[in-house]
């Protein structure tokens, strides 16, 4: 679940010279801290990541992502992969599904979570199926990690190493859960996440 932070953007670049790398990612995130900090923690050897936290949700985030992508291209920065990362939260089913459709129609891949990004973290520890309100995520994560979960700056960067040994299981669980929902619209697939797809892509370049 995204929270407003006066730091509206963070640009995270692995390399300054786009010509010297094999792959580049532009990741536009709903959350200002949690998601960008997490993706910044990936130690990529043959790719660059530019992750921006916008503090916007669903359709507005996708619209902003298109603007950012176009601005980057005008500067001569053409990325290999474009992603948006956002949550269902309490937004309407229509807005959530439409945001996914709009993103994909504009050339973005989508790493969504229903209900919130922290569900991806929970899957590192157990196979959590069914409805879990996002307000419970932080307490559940704190219990699992033996450290108080926080949305403050760089917290998810710090816990990346803690989560990493469990990442293969999280990917497997997220994929299995998503498959179980079949053709269920994303807005009704509670709980589920496609963050694992972005994680798998990033892992190709570690």
Model-derived regions, located:
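C-terminal accessory helical subdomains adjacent to catalytic cores in phosphodiester-
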Residues: 2-26, 35-36, 40-52, 71-83, ...
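A broadly used, surface-exposed interaction patch
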Residues: 50, 54-72
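Helix N-cap/beta->alpha junction signal
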Residues: 30-32
